[in-house]
């Protein structure tokens, strides 16, 4: 049960203000912040005065917070007389605020309602019981759009869980909640005209995603990956998983977010990702049989007028639930094979003078956008809506990092864009040691954009897809601390940002999250590789960015518990040893399991080279739709390329199976480090020995392993597969930590 512990945000904070100028480690960092000498202490009664009726909800929001914080009665009044005063000041920057705490109390002035709410967020983060430091803050956001997306289709999150997330967004001045309400795996919002969408479409038998969660819960000793009993129901002999929001639920969540200055943007993904609709209402798809095609699911049929009418009717009900200007149509990852075979689609293409199925998708998107505009709404879509022609009024969420020209092209046309590049902003990807920093230091206004183009960058959001996120705890674990980095990236100006200082302030935020019982991800334990090679002796060293974390370990294959040995000092081994490590919070909450294999090796002997060599590697591309590296060579051969590094060759896309071969030449007898990043699977073999093994479906992940090599040439093979976009990169380092340049080490037969 959610206890709405977020209303108690600072009630539980007991960090001591030991002197009058103690720093308040606010995130996002304010534009200007000046400390005074002294503290303001609340009396026995608290009065919040507001000078504009539009601020009444904000006064009640703050009043509820202070009541929980201080255990005293708080009165809100429509005047400017009170310990706390809320007012509007149109001279402040848009959405900006000015906060002053002095002997008279707390004075909050905002350019608008959202500015006042942002000042309240600052107060929520300040550590106090009954006193606050004298301080003067002036602040305003850098970007208009500061958002998060939650996918409630793959796994369902209750109304209370969504409200908890929204309250956390408000704590960090985020102002756009992108609510992904429908997808193939579940329809999550009541549409009264089409009741089967929720009575059937919101419930499913366990699918592959559910089974992976259950399997990982065991493999990783993690109960947060188990499917919640509250989201199950039994029908006959079947156990179903799911749930949905009534229209009353949606109105309640929208009102809750509005009070906290957050706009909700609903997404009903179409024409693809629509299986939960087309499987329950026959006639929406091209053919009676629906399911999965070569890559994605059966889409809606844009050749049928009745299908378009269905979509309009769905959105008509949603318009009444969401009062804001933007709605999101999705528009990504559409399987067009059915459209090529469908008489209705082909008739539509001919009738409208379209060239192909890409333009048919664009025609469908434009039809829906016209309907949105006629109802006073503006359309947002994933960047695939640019294919086949983009309207002049659509806003694009750019997510495909392998389509880097989208931002430049869209903004050059005069359209707005919202950044959410998957490599950095997809927080369903496992967090690694550089993840927070990559978000924090992401450049939203790159030099290649003109001033006019930069004006069309609305901001940024991070997306949480929930195929493998079944619970509230796992959701919050994936959001934090990355949400905090995104908050500062989107709010603060670059000249105020510094990652070292942010890292210091992040420790203070961990204390807040601990007090609020938010199960954030304990930072990466570091200092070692996935596989560490040694010839005589190896030494395990461990560090953690959270100084309150306790690291425990085992060497017998069991998972560490609170009773396992605590890592205190470096551990030296002279035989192969398999460490399993796990950080624990002060309250005993377990973090993520990490494995470190210390492997005793002899140096691999170099091979004798008989043929003439040239710089580079050979990359063979196979039309591979499988999910294991060992079968790539059995797939149909497409083409061969020469590459100068381990990477995906230009023009290789779709179903990708790569076998990259050649030789690696190392200069000295040494232990070399290989950092292989891939999305999806990959492996690296040297002289036939497996060095890095990521032979699995995965989001972007870097595995770092070592191998002892004698100087000279060694046979080299990288295998890689992916089916939509993908990433592949290999960096090689010597024992001194210096990266070896690809042109110096890679060779292949002439």
Language model: regions and residue ranges:
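Flexible, acidic glycine-rich loops studded with aromatic residues
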Residues: 379-384, 389-394, 400-541
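Active-site neighborhood of glycoside hydrolase catalytic domains
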Residues: 277-282, 288-393, 400-409
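Feature activates predominantly on carbohydrate-active enzymes
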Residues: 92-299, 304-308, 316-326, 367, ...
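Short beta-strand-plus-loop segments that form exposed binding edges in beta-rich domains
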Residues: 717-726
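Contiguous, structured surface segment used for ligand recognition
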Residues: 22-145, 474, 490-500, 508-512, ...
């Amino acid at each position: 049960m959610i206890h709405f512990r977020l209303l108690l945000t600072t009630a539980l904070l007991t960090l001591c203000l030991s002197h009058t100028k103690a720093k308040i480690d606010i995130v996002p960092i304010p534009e200007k912040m000046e400390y005074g000498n002294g503290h303001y202490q609340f009396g026995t009664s608290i009065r919040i005065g507001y000078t504009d009726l539009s601020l009444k909800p904000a006064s009640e929001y703050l009043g509820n917070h202070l009541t929980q914080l201080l255990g005293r009665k708080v009165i809100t009044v429509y005047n400017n007389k009170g310990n706390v005063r809320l007012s509007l000041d149109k001279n402040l920057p848009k959405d900006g605020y000015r906060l002053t705490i002095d002997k008279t109390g707390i004075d909050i002035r905002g350019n608008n309602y959202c500015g006042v709410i942002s000042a309240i967020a600052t107060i929520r983060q300040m550590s106090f019981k009954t006193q606050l430091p004298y301080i003067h803050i002036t602040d305003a956001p850098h970007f208009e759009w500061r958002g998060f997306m939650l996918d409630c289709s793959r796994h369902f999150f209750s109304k209370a869980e969504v409200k908890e997330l929204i309250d956390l967004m408000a704590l960090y001045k985020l102002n756009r909640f992108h609510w992904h309400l429908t997808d193939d795996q579940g329809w999550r919002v009541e549409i009264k005209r089409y009741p089967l969408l929720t009575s059937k479409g919101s419930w499913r038998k366990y699918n592959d995603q559910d089974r992976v969660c259950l399997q990982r819960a065991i493999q990783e000793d993690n109960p947060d990956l188990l499917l919640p009993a509250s989201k199950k129901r039994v029908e006959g002999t079947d156990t179903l998983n799911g749930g949905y929001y009534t229209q009353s639920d949606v109105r309640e969540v929208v009102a809750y977010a509005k009070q906290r200055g957050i706009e909700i943007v609903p997404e009903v993904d179409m024409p693809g990702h629509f299986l939960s609709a087309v499987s329950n209402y026959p006639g929406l798809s091209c053919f009676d049989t629906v399911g999965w095609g070569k890559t994605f699911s059966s889409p809606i049929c844009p050749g049928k007028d009745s299908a378009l009418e269905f979509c309009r009717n769905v959105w008509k009900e949603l318009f009444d639930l969401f009062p804001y200007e933007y709605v999101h149509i999705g528009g990504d990852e559409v399987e067009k094979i059915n459209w090529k075979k469908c008489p209705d689609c082909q008739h539509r293409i001919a009738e409208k003078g379209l060239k192909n199925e890409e333009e048919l998708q664009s025609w469908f998107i434009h039809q829906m956008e016209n309907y949105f505009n006629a109802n006073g709404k503006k359309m947002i879509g994933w960047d695939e809506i640019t294919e086949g022609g983009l309207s002049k009024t659509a806003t694009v969420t750019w997510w495909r990092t392998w389509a880097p020209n989208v931002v430049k092209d869209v903004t050059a046309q005069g359209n707005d864009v919202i950044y959410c590049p998957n490599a950095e902003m997809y927080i369903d990807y496992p967090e690694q040691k550089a993840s927070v920093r990559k978000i924090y230091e992401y450049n939203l206004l790159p030099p290649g954009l003109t001033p006019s183009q930069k004006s069309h960058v609305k901001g940024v959001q991070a997306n949480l897809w929930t195929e493998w996120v079944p619970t509230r705890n796992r959701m919050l674990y994936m959001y934090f601390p990355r949400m905090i980095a995104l908050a500062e990236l989107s709010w603060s100006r670059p000249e105020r940002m510094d990652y070292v200082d942010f890292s210091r302030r992040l420790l203070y935020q961990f204390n807040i999250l601990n007090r609020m019982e938010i199960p954030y991800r304990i930072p990466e334990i570091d200092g070692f590789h996935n596989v560490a090679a040694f010839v005589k002796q190896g030494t395990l060293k461990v560090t953690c960015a959270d100084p309150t974390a306790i690291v425990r370990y085992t060497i017998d294959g069991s998972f560490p518990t609170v009773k396992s040995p605590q890592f205190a000092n470096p551990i030296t081994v002279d035989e192969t040893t398999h460490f399993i490590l796990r950080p624990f919070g002060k309250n005993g909450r377990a973090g993520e399991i990490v494995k470190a294999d210390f492997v005793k090796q002899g140096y691999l002997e170099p091979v004798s080279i008989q043929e003439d060599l040239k710089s580079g590697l050979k990359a063979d591309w196979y039309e591979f739709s499988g999910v294991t590296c060992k079968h790539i060579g059995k797939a149909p051969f497409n083409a061969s390329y020469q590459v100068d590094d381990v990477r995906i060759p230009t023009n290789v896309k779709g179903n990708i199976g790569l076998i990259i071969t050649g030789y690696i030449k190392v200069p000295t007898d040494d232990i070399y480090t290989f950092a292989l990043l891939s999305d999806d699977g990959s492996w690296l073999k040297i002289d036939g020995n497996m060095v890095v093994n990521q032979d699995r479906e995965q989001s972007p992940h870097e595995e770092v392993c070592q191998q002892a090599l004698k100087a000279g040439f060694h046979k080299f093979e990288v295998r890689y597969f992916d089916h939509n976009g993908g990433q592949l990169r290999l960096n090689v380092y010597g024992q001194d930590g210096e990266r070896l340049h690809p042109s110096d080490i890679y060779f292949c037969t002439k």
